[in-house]
Amino acid sequence: MRHRFVVPSALVLVALLSAGPGQAYNGGPMRNVTDLTPTCAGCHSSVGKEQLRLEPDTLAASMLVENRHYEPIEEGTGPYKDMSPADRQKLLADVKLMDQSASATLSAPPTLKPGQEAQITATVRGGHGVVGVWVMESDLRLQGRPISADGWFIVGAPKVWGADGKEQTKWVDGRGAGLKKNLNAVLIFDQKADLAARKFPEGKVTWTVQAPHAPGTYTLAVAFHYGTEKASSVGTVTTVAGAILPKGGPGGPSGHILFSKPITVTVR
């Protein structure tokens, strides 16, 4: 017997509030040009249980992609209720392919001296449209923090490259005049997946950092936020205003969160 996990109403409210008017993560958190963690993306689906390992079982289950996103498509509930069985089957297959093809890795020197300057680089693959990359001190979705909370200092603006190999500054250029741009979070724009050809966009972000001054072993991970439905030929809906949204809606579960495997850096 299958057990359906229902997202508590309080979580739905958080998702809608964090989404902002009509956009959610559909076009990225464009107004939040600041340090970010995945807690701001309340409507997203989690890819993998490990990022929710400290949460109560019921809450964790409600956030997993299998229950939050796959199941409503498969059963034809919510925003998917008017889709034909054939279209739902295609959308589900396309979304699963997006997840199977998504990846995120993080690299950094294994050993640093206190305060030593170094570079850490995130490489991501997958998603469609705008994707988000946050560097964090753990791989916890709800309790992870920016690396600055663990003593790291980001030196200057992160360097961002999109699928075309060209450097992007759109995200950091959106920072308010006079504000520092040493952010832990970036958006990568114009990423396009071709499901028919099984081609998926890649992106790269490099942060120049100073190591913590306190000796010890530090954990680093990257949270990769990406959309899935808009890459599918049956995965969009057009509003009366002409906006193209995911089939699941702007505050729906089609945005997914994937963490890289954590790495450790020893400061000594």
Go through each PLM region and give its residues.
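Bacterial N-terminal signal peptides
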Residues: S9-S18
